[in-house]
Amino acid sequence: MCIRDRANTFKTVTFAAEPASAGTPYVMYTVAGSTTTVILGLRVTNIHTTSVTVEVELVSDTANRGGNNNVTNGTAFLAKDVVIPAKSSLEILAGSKIVMETTDVLQIDCSVADKVSGTLSVMEIT
């Protein structure tokens, strides 16, 4: 199947107050089977009365690509220990795009439980 024959679906994923417990990342998105996802944007808002520290991770175990790129992916930080002031928002990707493969996970953690809200925009290619 040629990529131009595949369906592109735009989606928005929102979360109101996460993670439930500081130190336990909240899974924002998991790529479905037979799907490639392009992250178009991620905006995170601090809903707390003081600054919080945020981490955004891409967790991937994709492997078996063949050729010179036949290595297993791991966890990559898209944001690490980023301070967001009280009542402020941060655009994590700021114009960049990230490709996610089947079973990849995007997750967020915060220094204080239930104090970040956000919107994730993606395009799924199926």
What are these regions (language model features)?
Residues M1-I3:
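Short, small-residue-biased leader/transition segments that mark boundaries at the very start
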Residues T9-A16, P25-A32, G67-V83:
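Local beta-strand/beta-hairpin segments that build beta-sheet-rich folds
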Residues T62-T103:
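Intrinsically disordered, low-complexity Pro/Gly/Ser/Thr-rich segments with frequent PxxP/GP/PP motifs
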Residues G95-S96, S111-A113, S121-I125:
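Beta-hairpin (beta-strand-turn-beta-strand) motif
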